[in-house]
A protein has these predicted regions:
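Blade-loop segments of beta-propeller domains
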Residues: 161-198, 204-214
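Edge beta-strands of extracellular beta-sandwich domains
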Residues: 97-106
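Bacterial signal peptide processing site
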Residues: 20-23
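Conserved beta-strand positions in repeat-built beta-propeller and related beta-rich domains
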Residues: 143-147, 187-192, 229-233, 274-278
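Beta-rich, blade/repeat-based domains predominating
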Residues: 127-138, 171-182, 212-224, 256-268, ...
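C-terminal motif of bacterial Sec signal peptides marking the signal peptidase cleavage site
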Residues: 15-18
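Short loop/turn segments that connect beta-strands within beta-propeller blades
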Residues: 157-161, 199-203, 241-244, 286-290
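A short helix->beta-strand "capping" segment at the edge of beta-propeller domains
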Residues: 108-127, 158-164
Length: 318
């Protein structure tokens, strides 16, 4: 290395150190004070906010917001969606402005009800299928199966397990949940970042759609005007029924905390039914705020099916 290069590096380093030493520590004058305990509050409560001002600055005004939406310093939470929130206080003082932030969690006020089930009938099913999604549409059962190199889309006569239509997915796709709307089938892939669209009658491909912030596809259902999609977290993403773009999301919470690994979904009488991967229960979720209103216990259902080496976990609802 030449002397010029060494001097150049030393000089540049000196400038960086000099600039670094001249900077002053950021003064924090305000913080958010609330009636929240351990950053958790119930949606039955009223959020009460104020500002801590230890340096006795002359405050002109304070503007509060929750996830960028303006709120007052006395806000009932009954109409607020559950989950993690960022509180922001913008403080105007002495011709200046300073922002204080606080992360909180809004949980449900009620404990989920516990439901059991009644087995009313059984039907034959292909035990080699790694079922990911099921849905009835005009009397036909549609099934999406998983595993790389084995994923399929099928239409079935469920009473005798006759395959009416069947297509194999590309070996690079791991099939996940599916739903049907307006004579179209929407099938998710797991980690491939896109969903597949088919004509319900011919199974002809009608294109695909890309995921947004949700990086994986697990389960999907619809209410006739919107799609709801899971990604394995506590989030349920709300998709536009025409563009398939993610417009919003809700977070599934009980009175104690979030429920993760949300998987297959089904829309039933205004509620979202969601099973959890590797769990034996199905959560009944309020689509307006993410509240888990009930849990259906299916733990003994696994004992009622044929035991074989490929048996894995409960999955698929229709």
């Amino acid at each position: 290395m030449s002397i010029f290069k060494i001097l150049k590096i030393i000089t540049l380093g000196g400038i960086i150190c000099s600039c670094g030493n001249s900077s002053k520590p950021l003064m924090i004058n305000f913080s958010i004070q609330s009636n929240i305990k351990k950053n958790i509050i119930s949606n039955a409560d009223t959020l009460k906010l104020s500002i801590l001002n230890p340096n006795n600055k002359k405050v002109d005004s304070v503007a509060f917001s929750m996830n960028s939406r303006r709120i007052s310093d006395n806000t009932p939470l009954k109409s607020i969606a559950l989950g993690e929130k960022i509180l922001k206080a913008t403080v105007f003082f002495e011709d200046k402005r300073e922002v204080a932030l606080l992360k909180i969690i809004v949980v449900n006020s009620n404990t989920p009800k516990l439901y059991n089930y009644e087995l009313v009938n059984t039907y034959p099913h292909d035990i080699t299928s790694y079922t990911q999604g099921l849905e009835f549409y005009k009397g036909v059962l549609y099934e999406s199966t998983g595993q790389y190199g084995e994923s399929k889309l099928r239409a079935l006569d469920y009473k005798n397990n006759t395959i009416l239509k069947n297509i194999e997915l590309s070996p690079g796709y791991f099939g996940e949940g599916l739903t049907l709307l307006k004579d179209k089938i929407y099938q998710l892939t797991w980690q491939e970042g896109r969903g597949l669209i088919y004509d319900v009658n011919s199974f002809e491909s009608l294109g695909n759609f890309k995921y947004g912030q949700s990086k994986e596809g697990w389960g999907i259902c619809n209410n006739g005007s919107q799609f709801y999609k899971t990604d394995g977290s506590e989030n349920i993403w709300i998709l536009n029924s025409e563009t398939l773009e993610e417009e919003n999301f809700i977070q599934a919470y009980t009175n104690k905390g979030k429920l993760t690994n949300l998987n297959e979904l089904e829309w039933v009488e205004g509620k979202i039914y969601a099973n959890r991967y590797q769990k034996n229960g199905v959560a009944v979720i309020n689509p307006a705020n993410g509240a888990i209103e009930a849990v259906i216990d299916f733990k003994d259902l696994k004992d009622k099916v044929r035991i074989h080496p490929g048996l894995d976990v409960l999955n698929g609802m229709a």
